[in-house]
Amino acid sequence: MFQDKGWVLVTLIALVTPSWAAYKLQERYSWNQLDFAFPNARLKEQALASGDYIPQNALPVGVEHFGNRLFVTVPRWRDGIPATLTYINMDRSLTGSPELIPYPDWRSNTAGDCANSITTAYRIKVDECGRLWVLDTGTVGIGNTTTNPCPYAVNVYDLTTDTRIRRYVLPAVDTNPNTFIANIAVDIGKNCDDAYAYFADELGYGLIAYSWEQDKSWRFSAHSYFFPDPLRGDFNVAGINFQWGEEGIFGMSLSPIRSDGYRTLYFSPLASHRQFAVSTRILRDETRTEDSYHDFVALDERGPNSHTTSRVMSDDGIELFNLIDQNAVGCWHSSMPYSPQFHGIVDRDDVGLVFPADVKIDENKNVWVLSDRMPVFLLSDLDYSDTNFRIYTAPLATLIENTVCDLRNNAYGPPNTVSIPKQAVLPVGPPLYTKQYRPVLPQKPQTSWASSPPPPSRTYLPANSGNVVSSISVSTNTVGPAGVEVPKAYIFNQHNGINYETSGPHLFPTLQPAQSGRQDGGLKTYVNARQSGWWHHQHQG
């Protein structure tokens, strides 16, 4: 009898435990506040004293992975942001709270040096040709105090040589007085020269296409799908209610190349629960900017509380997207209809994933998620004794396992009938070409589709204090509902960067001998704190 009661108790516990209790994303890096790899302690002290560096004013918003580097962007929303485009040397910093290294160097992060530097970067993209695409918005500040010392400019870097190989200034005809662009999608066709970039103008309500080969851009602006939904402008994140009702086209993802040689661009306005689509055949054609209304397709709504700012699609058609109202990351397999029953949640965390600002899939099908508590930063006050910013990672196969997006383990059907007009959506073929990449360190074993052990429960890697975060600390000085202007996604900066006469992205190591609690020259032995985690690194030599 007692055995039967015990079985019933276990069953009840299993029934009430949410499906995301066994966390799949694993925390790789975390910070109470961001730190930067200054050339030396004296220059850092000078920057702190002058206001060129104010640690509490830095918020990470974008992440991208390539080889042994993890790129992180920090917009110049407030004073004291020394660099906007940075990276982590993953060989030296396997976990913890590493200093951010300016990329490609300090001089290239000087705000206001329009021709030679990046003033503010948001989300960035590495393509399969080893190029890093960065849109410099040229702005400092946020909301009504935003200024534009520089024009919008596309900057492309060769990640093999760490040099800028292209700078293209968007012409005035492609922007308007309300323009704000924070997202980029890169479309590679038959070769590396057959490349296009697409930019979502969130507040100017347009979509800009740029051709690498032509070194030219054009704007699609005459479409209602770029505008916010007036019924979807109310947001609730981390116990804060706010309205971003003006936010239009924002997150974008690109499908694999289809049988006709083109991709599908999926996008959503931020103030919306709906996804839209258009073929890149239309976007690549400058002559279609004014007569393409009916080439855009409206898909279903995702359901309630499904605002999203970032999305990405794998080369086999699996889309991941952040769900900022739900502290979660969702998924959809593009071979299925775009309806709520075919949307899954791959992970959720009401502490660690508060505002998962960016989601990326790298060349090895590993997923990277950056969370930053942005609404708390903008509308209240962060507690800098708490962990505020985190970067998570996991293999894509692990994330979608046992979700509706894992078609190999589920018998869902029928195939998706939603397609771009005049085009057939056929199974995705092999890539047209491949390119060698630098090895990712540390290596992670591949997860089998056929059989995989349950993902480990999440135990946070030790931060500076070594304590597990159990709650979000938010200042009691919350913003009232009346008479308060909610900042948009972009306060004037009097100290706009540091112009150090140094060069080379690898000049300054991230681990200094004088730093307390750190080893010079890298970690000699590292085993994932979960004991059964993915990373196991033995320092050679």
UniProtKB/Swiss-Prot annotation:
Keyword Signal: yes
Superkingdom in the source lineage: Eukaryota
Pfam families referenced in this protein's UniProt entry, alphabetically: MRJP (PF03022)
UniProt-annotated location(s): Secreted
InterPro entries: 6-blade_b-propeller_TolB-like, Royal_jelly/protein_yellow
Signal sequence annotation: 1-21
GO biological process: cuticle pigmentation; male courtship behavior, veined wing extension; melanin biosynthetic process; regulation of adult chitin-containing cuticle pigmentation
Recorded GO CC terms: cell hair; cytoplasm; extracellular region
Glycosylation sites: 144
Keyword presence, tRNA processing: no
Keywords noted in UniProt: Developmental protein, Glycoprotein, Secreted, Signal
Free-text function comment from the UniProt entry: Controls the pigmentation pattern of the adult cuticle and larval mouth parts.
Family note: Belongs to the major royal jelly protein family.
Protein name listed in UniProt: Protein yellow
Source organism per UniProt: Drosophila erecta (Fruit fly)
Gene name of the record: y
